[in-house]
A protein has these predicted regions:
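Conserved donor nucleotide-binding strand/loop of the catalytic core
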Residues: 49-75
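Short aromatic/hydrophobic "clamp" motif used to bind/position activated sugar donors
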Residues: 90
Length: 366
């Protein structure tokens, strides 16, 4: 089935002249209207207007000063919702993304305008997950005015039901937009989240952002340039562990759960704690958390990679090989879309080569 419903592209862009046309070229064949907020000072706005003029697709740009992500995303979403575009759906995209649609993609879910919204597959370097960036244009959506990790909702407190679109319709994220120019982006995210959630008294009522404080410090350990070097890294790892452990206890009452069950949030929390201990060279603790994590999501490989990396650093190649043999098992394929929370594509035999790389090290040295 081919596309029948009409789609409005919605975006918010800064100084993106280096990548904006790539995004537009990827999606123009699938859209019927566009509403794009511009808050930069380079040629991005004129590139957008010239591009769509050439393609004869109606829409408009508008200027709005930059405040912070939640406010600006909500402003551009409200502008799209209130525009006279006649579209059924609003598709959100960032400037450093591309839309990929397989030739055999089944458009029937999108043609059914009874759905409230869709979860779209998002792929970045080494990661795949779902995000709710495709909304029914007839409903009253809004972005919460979050400073980081903005969340989208229906007005009136109604819970929305998202349909998982097949991976044949996906966003590909290249992380080369203007927001990625700051090497300490994730540290800034963590501090901003602490300011609003901890100092603002919201932490215990908002488990989503509670988790992302820990994740932002985790990412700050993996990507950042700090004046105190490893001293800073260990401190941010400590903070990540602190938030993940308290998230598990406060949100999941983790210490009182008698039997594990499949839960990706618990799995990723334990895995990230293990990674922070590994980065801090506390291998015994790291191994313990990686083993514990696997109980909560046996199909996922991230914790197995963590174990292999620990044994590699310890020089225990025989034990490392026991783990890497699992990573190259042809049965341990990527579990997406059945499991979909920040799945690392590098760690599965059918989607990446890191497991084979670790296995070659183990075989060579054992």
């Amino acid at each position: 089935m081919k596309k029948e419903a009409k789609i409005c592209l919605n975006a918010m862009v800064g100084n993106e002249e280096h990548c904006i046309e790539r995004m537009l070229k990827s999606c123009y064949e699938y859209i019927d209207y566009w509403v794009i907020q511009c808050n930069g000072n380079d040629k991005t706005q004129s590139i957008i207007e010239d591009f769509f003029k050439d393609k004869d697709i109606p829409g408009f740009t508008y200027n709005h000063e930059w405040d912070y992500p939640g406010i600006n995303r909500d402003h551009t979403l409200q502008t799209a919702l209130n525009a006279e575009h006649g579209c059924d759906w609003i598709l959100r995209m960032d400037a450093d993304e591309q839309l990929e649609v397989d030739d055999d993609f089944d458009w029937s879910p999108i043609n059914d305008t009874n759905f409230e919204c869709f979860n779209i597959t998002a792929r970045s370097a080494g990661s795949i997950y779902y995000r709710t960036w495709f909304w029914n244009a007839k409903l009253a959506w809004y972005f919460e005015h979050d400073r980081r990790h903005e969340t989208v909702h229906l007005r009136g407190g109604a819970q929305h039901n998202a349909f998982n679109l097949a991976p044949g319709f996906r966003h590909v994220i290249t992380n080369d937009g203007v927001t990625w120019e700051d090497p300490n982006k994730f540290l800034v995210d963590a501090v901003e989240l602490e300011k609003t959630q901890v100092a603002g008294g919201k932490l215990l009522e908002d488990p989503y952002h509670f988790w992302y404080i820990g994740k932002s410090y985790y990412d700050a350990v993996n990507l950042g340039d700090y004046p105190l070097g490893m001293t800073h890294t260990k401190e941010y790892a400590r903070r990540s562990i602190f938030y993940f452990e308290n998230y598990l206890d406060r949100v999941h009452n983790y210490k009182n759960i008698e039997e594990p069950f499949v839960n990706e949030m618990i799995y990723m929390s334990l895995y990230c704690i293990g990674e922070m201990y590994r980065k801090s060279k506390e291998f015994e603790k790291a191994i313990s958390f990686f083993v514990e994590a696997e109980d909560w999501c046996p199909r996922r490989n991230e914790s197995i990679v963590g174990l292999a990396e620990c044994y590699n650093e310890l020089g225990d190649y025989e034990t490392m090989k026991m783990q890497t043999e699992r990573l190259v098992d042809p049965q341990r394929t990527i579990p997406f879309p059945e499991l979909y929370f920040l799945v690392n594509t590098n760690f599965y035999i059918d989607s990446g080569g890191y497991g084979k790389y670790l296995h070659s090290i183990a075989c060579k040295n054992s």
